[in-house]
């Protein structure tokens, strides 16, 4: 069924991040978000990404997918629940004086995995 996996699925997104290096996550994850928002179907999220990225990125991917699935009323795949919280909090913006804001604003499915982003993290133009 590999050939049926959409190009911008979370499975393929994680493959691209691995291939291009973990610092490439923003480009690939935001491409996934755009594609999923345009066509929110389970096809984009049902195949678990290979667990070959850092725990930070796996938690970020799971939090992103879970939040978008809830927003669009798409079934949450079981692989998402298997991604554990980080042992240390990750402030994605990494700007010291904005940590308090991301503590306040971070959506619940990010926060529960120890990831702190701004409220507009998933907002795309």
Report residues per predicted region.
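Charge-dense, extended regions
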Residues: 75-125
């Amino acid at each position: 069924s590999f050939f049926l996996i959409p190009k911008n699925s979370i499975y393929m997104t994680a493959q691209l991040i691995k291939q291009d290096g973990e610092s490439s996550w923003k480009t690939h994850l935001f491409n996934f978000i755009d594609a999923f928002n345009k066509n929110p179907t389970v096809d984009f999220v049902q195949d678990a990404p290979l667990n070959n990225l850092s725990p930070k990125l796996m938690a970020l991917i799971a939090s992103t997918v879970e939040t978008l699935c809830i927003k669009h009323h798409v079934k949450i795949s079981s692989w998402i629940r298997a991604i554990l919280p980080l042992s240390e909090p990750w402030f994605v913006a990494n700007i010291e004086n904005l940590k308090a804001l991301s503590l306040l604003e971070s959506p619940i499915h990010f926060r529960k995995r120890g990831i702190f982003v701004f409220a507009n993290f998933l907002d795309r133009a």
